[in-house]
């Protein structure tokens, strides 16, 4: 009798994706983050669903409905903080996942990579809209400042901003539509993630060496299912430590003050995972230039396959490129720190230098290092 998991139309898809999938025998823990992102997404959809049952998307009651969730709903506080801190874990996993792709040359799977970049944009948009929903001070002013950036677009800018706002300022219409989008987007992300996996399974996974692993494959189950479960346990442990001990560590105290259009907070800043892009935006004195730099800071990832000049795929055997990669990581951490600081000396100049360094590393220095390494191979 044939095994049902190999014959049943639905089970067959699951089997070919998670059980009998041929996987390289040498993929390290850096390959865990894909499955961790899947877990984060499921967690966010579930906690978000339960929050949506008690939340009201109205400017007069949004803030108090979040308070009501935390005070009166059974385990509402843990659902709310799991959702808020789950977003942080999601972005940590995302950055690790993208970093892994850059380090080991996974961007040469162009379709998979491009869908991944679209996923990154979609996740950032979702997180931004979610941050607006509690209708605290930082929610309101963050929404005002970030949506207002679109007014820098020539000719259609002002009309576009008013169209998104649904009026002449961030108000009830804005909150309602942001809630609608925030609810639907995770399902779009889930669909895109499936396309991402579909493209990945066309080629098979990359591995740390960057060399084809067709000659040495092992089944995904039990080897990598066990490995992924370990990663998942560590992720859930980290999330629970954050939620149960320091739930407000990554939040902004200003968001515990209800939104007030007449009172601007001293430092308007987004959540920590957007600070690197926010620092790049602020480091350019011109509004349109800043917006372009902001978009390009993420969109630049699409160019990486074209900027790959090395004869080797992975950075595993390329010390110069490795060095530049870790300088890029340090640069991004610097930008994240600067994004959270006030706009004054010396933070302005540090931010500008770090922004220049960011684009210089990706567009010029890393391709140059790869070319030098190619020449060294001839010696």
From Swiss-Prot:
Taxonomic lineage of the native organism: Eukaryota, Metazoa, Chordata, Craniata, Vertebrata
Gene: MT-CYB
Family: Belongs to the cytochrome b family.
UniProt keyword list: Electron transport, Heme, Iron, Membrane, Metal-binding, Mitochondrion, Mitochondrion inner membrane, Respiratory chain, Transmembrane, Transmembrane helix, Transport, Ubiquinone
Name the UniProt record assigns to this protein: Cytochrome b
GO MF entries: metal ion binding; ubiquinol-cytochrome-c reductase activity
Binding residues for heme b b566: 97, 196
First and last residue of the signal peptide: none
Transmembrane segments: 33-53, 77-98, 113-133, 178-198, 226-246, 288-308, 320-340, 347-367
């Amino acid at each position: 009798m044939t095994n049902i998991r190999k014959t049943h139309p639905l089970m067959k898809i699951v089997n070919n994706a998670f059980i009998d999938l041929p996987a390289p025998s040498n993929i390290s823990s850096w390959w865990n983050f894909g499955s961790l992102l899947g877990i984060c997404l499921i967690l966010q959809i579930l906690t978000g669903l339960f929050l949506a049952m008690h939340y009201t998307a109205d400017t007069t009651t949004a803030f108090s409905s979040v308070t009501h969730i935390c005070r009166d709903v059974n385990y509402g506080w843990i659902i709310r903080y799991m959702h808020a801190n789950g977003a942080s874990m999601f972005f940590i996993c995302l950055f690790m996942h993208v970093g892994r792709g850059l380090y080991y040359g996974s961007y040469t799977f162009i379709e998979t990579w491009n869908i991944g970049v679209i996923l990154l944009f979609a996740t950032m948009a979702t997180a931004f809209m979610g941050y607006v929903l509690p209708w605290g001070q930082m929610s309101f002013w963050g929404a005002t400042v970030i949506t207002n950036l679109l007014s820098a677009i020539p000719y259609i800018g002002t009309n576009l901003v008013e169209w998104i706002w649904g009026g002449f300022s961030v108000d009830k219409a804005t909150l309602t539509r942001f809630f609608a989008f925030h609810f639907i987007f995770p399902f779009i992300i889930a669909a895109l993630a499936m396309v991402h996996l579909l493209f990945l399974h066309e080629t098979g996974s990359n591995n740390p060496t960057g060399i084809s692993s067709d000659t040495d494959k092992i089944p995904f189950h039990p080897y990598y299912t066990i490995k992924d479960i370990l990663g998942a346990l560590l992720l859930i442990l980290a999330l629970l430590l954050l939620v149960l001990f320091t739930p407000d560590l990554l939040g902004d105290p200003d968001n515990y003050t209800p939104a007030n259009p007449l009172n601007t907070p001293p430092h308007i800043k987004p959540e920590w995972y957007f600070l690197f892009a926010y620092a790049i935006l602020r480091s350019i004195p011109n509004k349109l230039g800043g917006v372009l730099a902001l978009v390009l800071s993420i969109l630049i990832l699409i160019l990486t396959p074209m900027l790959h000049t090395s004869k080797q795929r992975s950075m595993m055997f390329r010390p110069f490129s490795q060095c530049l990669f870790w300088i890029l990581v340090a640069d991004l951490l610097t930008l994240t720190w600067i994004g959270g600081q006030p706009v004054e000396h010396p933070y302005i100049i540090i931010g500008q230098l770090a922004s220049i360094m960011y684009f210089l590393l990706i567009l010029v220095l890393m391709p140059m290092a790869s070319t030098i390494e190619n020449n060294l191979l001839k010696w």
